Amino acid sequence: MSNNFKDDFEKNRQSIDTNSHQDHTEDVEKDQSELEHQDTIENTEQQFPPRNAQRRKRRRDLATNHNKQVHNESQTSEDNVQNEAGTIDDRQVESSHSTESQEPSHQDSTPQHEEEYYNKNAFAMDKSHPEPIEDNDKHDTIKNAENNTEHSTVSDKSEAEQSQQPKPYFTTGANQSETSKNEHDNDSVKQDQDEPKEHHNGKKAAAIGAGTAGVAGAAGAMAASKAKKHSNDAQNKSNSGKANNSTEDKASQDKSKDHHNGKKGAAIGAGTAGLAGGAASKSASAASKPHASNNASQNHDEHDNHDRDKERKKGGMAKVLLPLIAAVLIIGALAIFGGMALNNHNNGTKENKIANTNKNNADESKDKDTSKDASKDKSKSTDSDKSKEDQDKATKDESDNDQNNANQANNQAQNNQNQQQANQNQQQQQQRQGGGQRHTVNGQENLYRIAIQYYGSGSPENVEKIRRANGLSGNNIRNGQQIVIP
């Protein structure tokens, strides 16, 4: 057996029956606690532990052994159920033979042979297709529940269950077309409802449908023969053919629904065949009225289920549409508020631009006014400077004129004085010429030497005399100049 568990999470999902596996569970828990203690000791001794690889392997081994034990117990329970179902079918076949022997000789024996044929085929299918070993806990749980249900049905409540089960028979005459039509509608509605749900359960229901088809065909043939005992063989054969066709349609529909779990329903089909055969043999005489009522109630229930599915679909659509509508409304509100915010931002930007423009214009006008005032002040200061300069110039001119006038007066006085001096010098010269001597200057002579020569002393008084007599202002004389000596 191969281990199909992928991780600890899948392994821990196993369902444990406390009534039958309590001792094994305690042993497993004890082993797990010992293994955990041993793993902790090994991990403390190791420097780099291998991430609990040995622990996971031991847990997988324990889970594999546990699954083997569960599978063996379920297999034995299935064998017991099959044996009990076989004994019940044998009893029912014997009772059907006895009742048919008491009936008139012209009664058709075809349904009995068909029932035996389908029972044999069902058990042959069960033996030829053994149940595969599966490690999935979900499948084991379903199989145990089915086995328990079949066992309790066969042992304790076979009679009550047979009376309560719907009778899969097919009426003859006018009711046959209505019954087949109702079954076809019911099958189509059931197929539409179950197709999206059971896509992954393929081959399991195919075998169940095949077994149910055989049982339904046999039971329908027996019920038809007992409901109308004086019908001929041809009519019975045609009825059984129609029943087989309808059951084959139903089997093909069930086969298209359940696709993945194939060979598991053979034993269930065999048990269903035995129960359906016994129920058909006991209640064929009064089967038409309950079957009609069952069809009506079944149709009503299926219509109710169909309406519920429609309401559920509508509710699902509403649940899907409401969040979408809410999301659209929220997005629209956000878009509106975002547009308003952008519009306000743009308006604020425009207002700021206008305010800045006005402010700039005001600043420019203020600057212009300031420049005008400055130019005015400058022109005023220039004018005042010019006027002050003109005034200063006029004052200076006036002072110059006054000074010139004074200079002219001084010059005139000086000229007068010079004129008088010249006149005096001229008079003195004339006096000297009349009573003094003349000396011609030669070489290096000067007034000091000339005074020594004529007066015997070069005193300043003598020199001054010579100057006065000649009208000299300094000591400068030239060669060849004639000097009067007084």
Swiss-Prot record:
Q: Where is the composition biased (Basic and acidic residues)?
A: 1-40, 103-118, 126-143, 180-199, 247-259, 299-314, 361-398
Record-annotated membrane-spanning stretches? 205-225, 320-340
What segment(s) does the record annotate as region Disordered? 1-314, 351-440
Entry GO CC? plasma membrane
Those parts of the protein on the Cytoplasmic side are: 226-319
Q: The LysM domain covers which part of the protein?
A: 437-485
- Its primary localisation, in coarse terms, equals membrane
Pfam families annotated for this entry? Answer: LysM
Protein keywords: Cell membrane, Membrane, Transmembrane, Transmembrane helix
What's the superkingdom here?
Bacteria
**Residue ranges with Polar residues bias:** 64-85, 161-179, 233-246
| Chain segments carrying region Elastin-binding | 14-34
Signal peptide positions on this chain: none
Report the locations given in the UniProt record.
Cell membrane
Q: Where is the composition biased (Low complexity)?
A: 204-225, 278-297, 403-431
How does the protein's chain sit in the membrane according to the entry?
Answer: Multi-pass membrane protein
Q: Which residues lie on this side of the membrane: Extracellular?
A: 2-204, 341-486
Q: What does this protein do?
A: Promotes binding of soluble elastin peptides and tropoelastin to S.aureus cells although it is not able to promote bacterial adherence to immobilized elastin and, therefore, is not a microbial surface component recognizing adhesive matrix molecule (MSCRAMM). May be involved in sensing the environment or in nutrient transport, since its loss caused a growth defect.
Q: What is known of its domains?
A: The elastin-binding domain is located between residues 13-33 at the surface-exposed N-terminus, whereas the C-terminus, containing the LysM peptidoglycan-binding domain, is not exposed on the surface of intact cells and presumably remains buried within the peptidoglycan. The presence of the TNSHQD sequence, corresponding to residues 18-23, is essential for EbpS activity but not sufficient, additional flanking amino acids in the amino- or carboxy-terminal are required for elastin recognition.
Cite the NCBIfam families for this sequence. elast_bind_EbpS
Q: What is this protein called?
A: Elastin-binding protein EbpS
